[in-house]
Structures are given as structure tokens and as C-alpha cells.
């Protein structure tokens, strides 16, 4: 799934999380979150876990 980096950054800022704390909250390795952030894509389950950790709907961080 394509993740919009800007939307992800905004959601992280709203939740007051950096990549490390997001990874811990999503219960996934830090490199996984960094890869999503840099590549802009990931598996549906991964984006779902990130959205859940941010307390948002997954559609809020998907690319248009």
C-alpha cells in the first residue's frame, strides 16, 4: 500500500511521536517504520498497525 509521507509526518506530529516511539507503540521493529517512511509503501497489515498506533483511520495516511 502507498503511504503519503507528508500525511504520515502530520499524524506523527499530532500524536507527538517520532519514528522510534511509533515503532514501539506499533510493536514493530524500528527499521520497519523507517522503511515505510523512506519508501512510502508497505504491506496492508503494517500500515494498519501504524495507523492504530497513531490513533487514526488508515485512510488518513494513504496516498491519494
Cite the ranges covered by each PLM segment.
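A short, Lys/Arg-rich alpha-helix, primarily the initiator
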Residues: 1-20
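Key DNA-contacting residues within the recognition helix of helix-turn-helix
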Residues: 9, 34-35, 48, 62
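The alpha-helix within a helix-turn-helix
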Residues: 12, 23, 51
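Short, basic-rich loop-to-helix N-cap that marks the start of a DNA-contacting helix
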Residues: 39-52
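Short C-terminal boundary/hinge segments that cap the last helix of small helical domains
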Residues: 55-64
Amino acid at each position: 500500500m502507498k503511504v503519503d509521507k507528508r500525511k504520515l509526518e502530520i499524524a506523527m506530529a499530532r500524536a507527538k511521536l517520532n519514528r522510534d516511539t511509533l515503532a514501539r507503540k506499533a510493536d514493530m521493529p524500528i527499521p520497519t517504520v523507517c522503511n515505510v517512511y523512506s519508501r512510502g509503501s508497505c504491506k496492508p497489515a503494517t500500515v494498519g498497525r501504524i495507523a492504530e498506533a497513531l490513533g487514526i483511520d488508515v485512510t488518513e495516511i494513504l496516498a491519494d
